[in-house]
């Protein structure tokens, strides 16, 4: 069996259906005797260019171990699923189980947003009235 990394771009209106789609694809892999090593949901992200008049897509990364028959079945399922805008399958030399560079970026962005939200709730922002009530700085002569 060979190791593969699959990147899927899902229609943004179908984001709620992503877990069901993943379970269906995992079932196809397991039925063929393969294994799923890693599943990463990168969420909705901006596309570099329009695809089917869409500027955003829901990204998924799946690392699997499967034989060629299972891969052919998966490729066929991706091709005829209208929710899958694009897919890319890359052959890997070994199983990849650690977080990808993209997932580390996603986690970093989530941490930054959470810390900003925490800072905004603890330190209230200065209102325009506060600036008007502040004493004037040194007069110019």
Swiss-Prot record:
**Keywords, alphabetical:** Ribonucleoprotein, Ribosomal protein, RNA-binding, rRNA-binding
The molecular function terms in GO held by this entry are: small ribosomal subunit rRNA binding; structural constituent of ribosome
Q: Which Pfam families match?
A: Ribosomal_S6
> In Gene Ontology terms, what is a biological process of this protein?
translation
Composition bias (Low complexity) maps to 123-141
State the InterPro entries in the record.
Ribosomal_bS6, Ribosomal_bS6_CS, Ribosomal_bS6_sf, Ribosomal_S6_plastid/chlpt, Transl_elong_EF1B/ribsomal_bS6
Q: Where is this region: Disordered?
A: 96-141
Q: Which domain of life is it from?
A: Bacteria
On whether RNA-binding is a keyword of this UniProt record, the answer is yes
One Gene Ontology term, aspect cellular component: cytosolic small ribosomal subunit
The question of whether Ribonucleoprotein is a record keyword is answered with yes
Instruction: Tell me which family the UniProt entry assigns to this protein.
Output: Belongs to the bacterial ribosomal protein bS6 family.
Q: What does this protein do?
A: Binds together with bS18 to 16S ribosomal RNA.
This one is known as Small ribosomal subunit protein bS6
* Top-level taxonomy: Bacteria, Pseudomonadati, Pseudomonadota, Betaproteobacteria, Burkholderiales
The primary gene name is rpsF
